[in-house]
Amino acid sequence: LFNETQRLFKESEQRAAELAIINSVQAALAAELSMQGIYDAVGDKIREIFDQADLSIRIHDARTGLIHYPYAYEGGKRIDIASSPLGEAGFTAHVLRTRETVVVNENMADAATRHGSFVLPGTLMEKSALFVPLVAGDQARGLINLIDVERENAYSASDVRLLQTLANSMSVALENARLFDETQRLLKETEQRN
């Protein structure tokens, strides 16, 4: 009974910590209407939560078929990754097509081969990876990719749940920013006609 009580107490503490993180991200998102500001706010918070983890936020432009990387860190440094065409294979294509989270905690080379994935030029092969879709409506518009280049089994079920919740919040904020930009554009067009 004591062990069960301790386990439940620990779970409650962990869940309370997750909710505090989610609330702080929600507060940051509420103050932000620019898309890049949203990428930066969420990306910075994820890096803080996951001990300065390497991560990228990838956005799919369905019109051009390109993947853009508005936020990317590797080895503790912000990096620029050139936009690239979305291929038919790979982790990114799979997540965008299925809208499913992918967790790879071991045997990364095997998982990469199975998915037809490859290491982006100028980046390192990870040992653990977490890919969480950014879904708006019925489409995955992008994803958050969290990686660990040093450890296998880096991501727990609670890590996955937390990142999924943050991705959902980010998706809503990005859609709101997109709609705000569209409304502003239409308003300007209307004013110019009058």
Predicted regions and their residues:
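Signal-transducing coupling segments at domain and membrane junctions
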Residues: L66, G76-I79, N105-S128, D148-N153
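A short, aliphatic-rich beta-strand micro-motif
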Residues: K127-V135
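GAF sensory/regulatory domain recognition
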Residues: G43-F50, L55-E88, E100, N107-D110
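Flexible loop/coil segments at beta-strand boundaries within sensory signal-transduction domains
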Residues: R63-T64, V135-A140, V149-E150, R161
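Amphipathic alpha-helical coiled-coil segments that mediate homodimerization
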Residues: I21-L29, S34-F50, I57, F91
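Allosteric cytosolic regulatory segments
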Residues: Q164-S171
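Signal-transmission linkers at sensory-effector interfaces
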Residues: F2-A31, Q36, R141, S158, ...
